[in-house]
C-alpha cells in the first residue's frame, strides 16, 4: 500500500525499471503477478490523489480512445521488402555478387522475426506517428495503438527527425496465454503469433491492444540525418535511445561465418522467445549500401535467408473431400492437432488420390507433416513402422460429397462434372471476385457463403442483380456495408478483358495466359484448338481446356460479356504495329533496367510485341540490363537478338 507522495514517486520509478527489464532486456525481475499487484496499488493511489498523477506513470503512458478507422499515411522514405534466399547455393550466389565488387564488405546478421513491420516517426524527440508497412509507400496510421506497446518510447533523447523501424511481435508465451483466455471465453483462436500481433495492433479499441502484451523490436531506420558509417552503428544508436536490442545479432566477414550463425539460429529457433522464419543479412557499410541501391521491390544490399520447413509427426484421424471450382476433388487429412512454427495444424492436403496410393498413406497412419515456408501444411510420408493393425485404406469416392453427382475418375485427378454443383459454384465465385480477377472489394469467402445459403446467387450473373434489401438479410450487414458492396459490384463492370477471362476460372488458364488471350480481342474464346496452339506459351492441355469450357458455357459467357462490357484495349492494332521493329516479335526482358521491366513491357506490347518470361528458340529479342544471368546465356545459345537498354531506347525513338 502506497502511503505518501514520496512512496508514489518511488513506485513509478520501480515499475518503469521492471518494465525496462521485462520488455527491453528480456530479463524479468519479478513475476507478472507481483508486477500486477504493484501496478494496481499505484493505480489505486492515483484514483485517490488525481492531482499528484505524474506524466511518466505507467498508467499514463497511453490514452484509451477508441478509433473509428485507420487512415492511410505515407512513409517519409519507402519501406522495402527483402528478397529471399532458401539454401546454401543461393546465399553463396548472393554474397558473390556483392563481394566481387566490394571484397571488404561485412554483413550484419539477425533473427527474422515473424511479426508486423511498423514505422515510428519521431520529431523533436516525440513520437508523432506510427504507421504499418502497408504497400511500402504508405500504411495504416496506428499511433494510438502503438503507444500501448510497452517498449515503444513516447519520447527519445534525440531531437532530429527520424523514422525508427521494427517488428511488432507477441512472444510465444504470451500468445499461448492469449489463446487460452480466448478458448475459455469461447472466442476464435488466433492461428499463430503473427496473426495475433497484427490483429492486436489493428484493434479499433485501443484498450484491447493494451492487454495483448505486444513488443517492438527495432531493425533499422528510414529517414534520418545520422552520420554513421555502418548499419551496426545505427542499430546501436537506436538501442541507446531506449529501445530493445536484437538478440543473436552478429557481424560477419564471410560466407562461412554467416552459415555458422544461420545454423546456430536454427538450433535456437524452438527456444527463442518469439516466432522466427529466417535470418536477415544486411551489408554493414552504408556507403556500399548506397552504391548497391535497389531493385524495383527490394534492396540489393540485404536479403532474408529463410529457414527450412519444419516437420512434425502426427496421426491421420479422418479424411474429407473438398470440391474446387474446376470440379477437382481434393482429399484433405484431418489430423491430431500438432504445433508447427507457432501454428496449430489440424488439416493437411493429400493433393489427390493418386498421390495417396503412391505414398501408401492410410487412415490412422502416423505421418510426417511440414509447413512449407512455415505456411502450407503438407503430408510428406507415412511412418509405416508405427502401424499397429488399426490402419485402413483411404477409399476414392465415387460420388460428389456435395451434390452426389457421379464422379469422373481419371488417372491422377477425380472430378465432379456437375456444373451446377454448389461447391463448384461457390469456389468459382470466390475466384471471380478475387484480386487477380475482378477484384470486388468486400466480396469475400464468408459473404459468398451467406449469399448461397440465402439462395440469393447461383452464378456470377446473379451478383449484378442483387438489391440493397437482399444484402440486408445477411449477418452483420447494415445499410452502409450493403451499399458499399453493391457499389463495388457495379464498379467491377467494364473490366480489362484479361481480368474477365481470368475471372472465368478456366482450368490451366491463369493471369499470364489471360493477358495473352486478351490481345486477340473479345471473341478470342471462340477460337479453335489449333488456333490456341499457335499462341505463345499455349500447350495441348490449355487449348483443349479453353475449347471444352467455351462449348459447355457458351450461353453463360455471352451473357456475362454483354452485361460487363469488358474493355478491349489490349487488342493488337495492325496499323500501330506496322512501323515498329518490335511488331509481332516475341521479347524477353531480364536484368536490372533504369525503369521497371513492366513499364518497358507495356510500351513494347503497345507496339504489338508479345512479352514472354522465358527464352526459347522462338524468342526474337532479349532486352538485357545489369545482372542478366542465365537468360543471356540461353539467348546466345539460340542466336536471339540481344539489345541493351541504350539500344532499346534508340529503337523506341525511331
Swiss-Prot record:
Signal peptide from the UniProt entry: none
Enzyme class: ligase
Coiled-coil intervals: none
Active site as annotated: 112
Enzyme Commission number(s): 6.5.1.2
InterPro entries listed in its UniProt record: BRCT_dom, BRCT_dom_sf, DNA_ligase, DNA_ligase_AS, DNA_ligase_CS, DNAligase_adenylation, DNAligase_N, Hlx-hairpin-Hlx_DNA-bd_motif
Residues passing through the membrane, by range: none
Annotated BRCT domain residues: 577-654
Superkingdom of origin organism: Bacteria
Residues that bind Zn(2+): 400, 403, 416, 421
Catalytic activity: NAD(+) + (deoxyribonucleotide)n-3'-hydroxyl + 5'-phospho-(deoxyribonucleotide)m = (deoxyribonucleotide)n+m + AMP + beta-nicotinamide D-nucleotide
GO annotations of cellular component type: cytosol
Stored Pfam families: BRCT (PF00533), DNA_ligase_aden (PF01653), DNA_ligase_OB (PF03120)
Amino-acid positions noted as binding NAD(+) in the UniProt annotation, renumbered to this chain: 32-36, 81-82, 133, 167, 306
Protein function: DNA ligase that catalyzes the formation of phosphodiester linkages between 5'-phosphoryl and 3'-hydroxyl groups in double-stranded DNA using NAD as a coenzyme and as the energy source for the reaction. It is essential for DNA replication and repair of damaged DNA.
Protein name: DNA ligase
Organism this protein belongs to: Helicobacter acinonychis (strain Sheeba)
Gene that encodes the chain: ligA
Amino acid at each position: 500500500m502506497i502511503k505518501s507522495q514520496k512512496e508514489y514517486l518511488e513506485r513509478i520509478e520501480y515499475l518503469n525499471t521492471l518494465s525496462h527489464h521485462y520488455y527491453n532486456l528480456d530479463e524479468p525481475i519479478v513475476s507478472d503477478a507481483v508486477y500486477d499487484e504493484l501496478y494496481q496499488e499505484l493505480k489505486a493511489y492515483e484514483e485517490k490523489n488525481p492531482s499528484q498523477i505524474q506524466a511518466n506513470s505507467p498508467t499514463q503512458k497511453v490514452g484509451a480512445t477508441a478509433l473509428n478507422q485507420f487512415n492511410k499515411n505515407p512513409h517519409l522514405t519507402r519501406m522495402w521488402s527483402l528478397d529471399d534466399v532458401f539454401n546454401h547455393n543461393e546465399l553463396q550466389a548472393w554474397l558473390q555478387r556483392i563481394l566481387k565488387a566490394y571484397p571488404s564488405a561485412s554483413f550484419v546478421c539477425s533473427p527474422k522475426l515473424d511479426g508486423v513491420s511498423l514505422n515510428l516517426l519521431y520529431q523533436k524527440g516525440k513520437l508523432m506517428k506510427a504507421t504499418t508497412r502497408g504497400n511500402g509507400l504508405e500504411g495504416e496510421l496506428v499511433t494510438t495503438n502503438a503507444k500501448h506497446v510497452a517498449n515503444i518510447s513516447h519520447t527519445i533523447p534525440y531531437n532530429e527527425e527520424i523514422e525508427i523501424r521494427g517488428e511488432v511481435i507477441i512472444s510465444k508465451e504470451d500468445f499461448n496465454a492469449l489463446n487460452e483466455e480466448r478458448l475459455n471465453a469461447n472466442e476464435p483462436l488466433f492461428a499463430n503469433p503473427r496473426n495475433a500481433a497484427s490483429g492486436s495492433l489493428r484493434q479499433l479499441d485501443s484498450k484491447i491492444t493494451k492487454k495483448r502484451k505486444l513488443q517492438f523490436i527495432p531493425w533499422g531506420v528510414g529517414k534520418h540525418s545520422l552520420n554513421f558509417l555502418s548499419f551496426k552503428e545505427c542499430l546501436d544508436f537506436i538501442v541507446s535511445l531506449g529501445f530493445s536490442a536484437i538478440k543473436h545479432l552478429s557481424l560477419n566477414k564471410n560466407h562461412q561465418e554467416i552459415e555458422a550463425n544461420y545454423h546456430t539460429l536454427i538450433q535456437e529457433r524452438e527456444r527463442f522467445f518469439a516466432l522466427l522464419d529466417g535470418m536477415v543479412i544486411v551489408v554493414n557499410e552504408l556507403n556500399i549500401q548506397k552504391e548497391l541501391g535497389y531493385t524495383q521491390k527490394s534492396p540489393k544490399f540485404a536479403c532474408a535467408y529463410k529457414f527450412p520447413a519444419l516437420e512434425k509427426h502426427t496421426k491421420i484421424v479422418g479424411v474429407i473431400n473438398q470440391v474446387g471450382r474446376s470440379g477437382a476433388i481434393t482429399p484433405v487429412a484431418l489430423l491430431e492437432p500438432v504445433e508447427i512454427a507457432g501454428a496449430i495444424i489440424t488439416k493437411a492436403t493429400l493433393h489427390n488420390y493418386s498421390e495417396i496410393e503412391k505414398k501408401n498413406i492410410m487412415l490412422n497412419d502416423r505421418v510426417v507433416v511440414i509447413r512449407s515456408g512455415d505456411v502450407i501444411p503438407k503430408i510428406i510420408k507415412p511412418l509405416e513402422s508405427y502401424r499397429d493393425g488399426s490402419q485402413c485404406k483411404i477409399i476414392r469416392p465415387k460420388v460428389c460429397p456435395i451434390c452426389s453427382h457421379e464422379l469422373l475418375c481419371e488417372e491422377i485427378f477425380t472430378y465432379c462434372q456437375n456444373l451446377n454443383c454448389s461447391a463448384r459454384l461457390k469456389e468459382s465465385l470466390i475466384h471471380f471476385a478475387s484480386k487477380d480477377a475482378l477484384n470486388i472489394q468486400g466480396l469475400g469467402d464468408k459473404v459468398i457463403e451467406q449469399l448461397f445459403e440465402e439462395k440469393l446467387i447461383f452464378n456470377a450473373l446473379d451478383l449484378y442483380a442483387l438489391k440493397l434489401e437482399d444484402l440486408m438479410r445477411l449477418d452483420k450487414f447494415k445499410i452502409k456495408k450493403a451499399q458499399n458492396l453493391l457499389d463495388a459490384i457495379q464498379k467491377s463492370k467494364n473490366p480489362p478483358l484479361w481480368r474477365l477471362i481470368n475471372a472465368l476460372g478456366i482450368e490451366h488458364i491463369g493471369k499470364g495466359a489471360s493477358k495473352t488471350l486478351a490481345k486477340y480481342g473479345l471473341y478470342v474464346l471462340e477460337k479453335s484448338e489449333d488456333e490456341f496452339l499457335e499462341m505463345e506459351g499455349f500447350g495441348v492441355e490449355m487449348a483443349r481446356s479453353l475449347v471444352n469450357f467455351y462449348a459447355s458455357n457458351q450461353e453463360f459467357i455471352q451473357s456475362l460479356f454483354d452485361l460487363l462490357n469488358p474493355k478491349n484495349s489490349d487488342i493488337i492494332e495492325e496499323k500501330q504495329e506496322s512501323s515498329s521493329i518490335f511488331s509481332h516479335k516475341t521479347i524477353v526482358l531480364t536484368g536490372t533496367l533504369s525503369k521497371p521491366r513492366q513499364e518497358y513491357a507495356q510500351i513494347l506490347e503497345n507496339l504489338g510485341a508479345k512479352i514472354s518470361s522465358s527464352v526459347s528458340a522462338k524468342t526474337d529479342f532479349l532486352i538485357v540490363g545489369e545482372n542478366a544471368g542465365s537468360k543471356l546465356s540461353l539467348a546466345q545459345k539460340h542466336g536471339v537478338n540481344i539489345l541493351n537498354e541504350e539500344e532499346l531506347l534508340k529503337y523506341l525513338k525511331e
